[in-house]
Regions:
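Catalytic alpha/beta active-site cores
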Residues: 2-3, 81-84, 88-403, 409-418, ...
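Catalytic or ion-translocation cores adjacent to nucleophile or general acid/base/metal-coordination motifs
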Residues: 2-9, 362, 382, 389, ...
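Short, well-ordered alpha-helical packing segments
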Residues: 22, 37, 41-44, 62, ...
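Generic structural "secondary-structure junction" signal
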Residues: 27-28, 340, 397, 453, ...
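N-terminal-proximal low-complexity accessory segments that begin disordered
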Residues: 2-76, 81-93
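Short acidic (Asp/Glu) and glycine-rich catalytic loops that position anionic groups and cofactors
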Residues: 16-19, 38-45, 62-64, 149-153, ...
Length: 471
């Protein structure tokens, strides 16, 4: 079936994408719809030829490298000659002087908190919600449901709750507390009643008092004690009315760990976004995450429920250095969400340029995913610093990093954002980036927030680049 396009500002935009941008993404951003399409088209037509030139240079380099290997097949490999050749064709760049990264307004999840990072397909709303909500997770559930606890001595996983396995979970968890939140004297195994908090001070003596950072009472009962280690938090839940807590001599119902600190919501390798319909599914889910209203109806074991983004977690601050502070301590309830756009190679028929060619998909991704982030700037439920985190994959060398920086600058101009609002995660997964990594970082020094390696892509490019080096 022939797809319907809307003609606007020298672009042919798929109707489903056009409606999404105009009716869903732009309202609430103070951006004028007509101005957006005018400026967007101008940038697309300006940058598309530059994008294409970079891809042609990739091809030229590969042809040159293949030819060099074929021409030198019968000679003993000479490392020095090979390196000089790579420099001559512009593959290896002269390394410049030392410099410092200048990225500003980075969230704590990036700069100060060590922890796991998830990657999920943005086209699957359930996976996206689960990942965003994985900031906090039950240690009891994780232990009970995995082979961390051996299925021996009657501790097998069964269809129904196995008390023997549950005891092993509790034993493991108490050892975890002794290791990570040690008491001054004794063990968490010896605690026989729910602790108390008086004027912000914990009734238990810790080896490191500063580890106790917050608490929560529900009515007159202590519900949570919040501890910190290495900037990660441990929340001990108490509940004498729950099936677990009422059998626990200390009333501990669960131990909640701060877990997935960041999540990459992926528009690239984990999805197949080949047309406007596919892209809009991903864009809509990302917009819902940025607005905070993404939710799905689910059914499990005959029970219907709504899955949505978890709220922030609220505590009362603990006493620190002799000062009592009854103010509120707010912990982020969700993983910091990053967005992986596609690389420079892909094009997509969702938008056609004035010559009928497909739009470079990375340009489209940069504009529309950033546009959706503007909604988060009002609530700051994702980025507290009003930053946009875009992970950019499959860049080949410093010139492509420069192009990414230019693209992000153009997006900021069109969307009227402060300079360097968009931060860049560099995926070091191409050989030309690895050997010129310092210069790639230099060209994104005001935006870079991480370096990451996709080892499968990196291995693949190593093989592809040197394919003709073999016998």
């Amino acid at each position: 079936m022939k797809k319907k396009y809307i003609n606007i500002e020298n672009l042919s935009v798929s109707e489903i994408l056009y409606d999404f941008v105009n009716k869903d993404a732009i309202p609430g951003t103070n951006i004028n719809i007509q101005n957006f399409w005018y400026k967007f088209s101008k940038v697309v037509h300006e940058l598309s030829p530059k994008n294409e030139a970079l891809l042609k240079f990739r091809q030229k380099l590969q042809i040159d490298i293949d030819k060099w290997h074929l021409d030198n097949k019968d000679k003993e490999f000479n490392q020095s000659e090979y390196e000089n050749f790579l420099k001559k064709i512009g593959y290896l760049i002269q390394e410049g002087p030392e410099f410092k990264i200048k990225t500003k307004n980075i969230d704590n999840e990036i700069s100060n908190i060590p922890g796991p990072q998830l990657v999920v397909p943005i086209t699957n709303s359930r996976y996206a919600l689960n990942a965003a909500n994985a900031r906090w997770g039950s240690l009891y559930d994780a232990l009970y449901g995995t082979d961390v606890i051996p299925e021996t001595e009657g501790a097998e996983r069964t269809n129904k709750y196995n008390p023997a396995r549950g005891e092993k979970v509790i034993e493991y968890a108490r050892n975890f507390l002794d290791k990570n939140v040690p008491l001054l004297n004794g063990s968490w195994k010896d605690i026989s009643e729910i602790p108390k908090v008086f004027n912000g001070k914990l009734s238990l003596d810790l080896k490191e008092k500063k580890q106790f950072v917050g608490y929560l009472y529900k009515e007159t009962n202590l519900y949570s004690l919040l501890f910190k280690k290495n900037n990660l938090h441990i929340d001990i839940n108490f509940n004498l009315k729950s099936s677990i807590g009422k059998k626990d001599k200390a009333g501990i119902n669960d131990i909640i760990l701060e877990s997935a600190i960041t999540t990459i919501m992926d528009h690239e390798d984990s999805v197949a976004g080949v047309d406007a319909e596919d892209k809009v599914v991903g864009y809509k889910n990302w917009l819902g995450l940025m607005k905070g209203n993404l939710q799905i109806e689910m059914e499990k074991d005959g029970r219907k429920f709504t899955r949505k983004l978890n709220p922030d977690r609220f505590y009362t601050k603990a006493e620190q250095k002799g000062e009592v502070d009854y103010s509120e301590l707010i912990m982020h309830g969700r993983s910091l969400m990053l967005n992986r756009n596609v690389g420079h190679l892909m094009t997509n028929p969702a938008i056609l340029l004035r010559d009928g060619s497909e739009i470079p998909e990375g340009i489209m991704d940069a504009f529309i995913t950033t546009l959706s982030c503007i909604h988060d700037f009002k609530t700051k439920k994702n980025s507290r610093t009003s930053s946009v985190y875009i992970v950019k994959p499959k860049m080949h060398g410093p010139d492509e990093a420069t192009f990414t920086n230019l693209l992000f600058s153009k997006v900021e101009e069109v969307l009227e954002l402060k300079k360097n609002t968009i931060k860049c995660g560099i995926m070091d997964e191409e050989r030309r980036t690895s050997v010129n990594l310092k210069e790639c970082i230099r060209n994104l020094q005001d935006r870079v927030f991480f370096i990451n390696t996709g080892f499968l892509d990196r291995t693949g490019d190593e093989i592809h680049t040197s394919m003709q080096a073999g016998p």
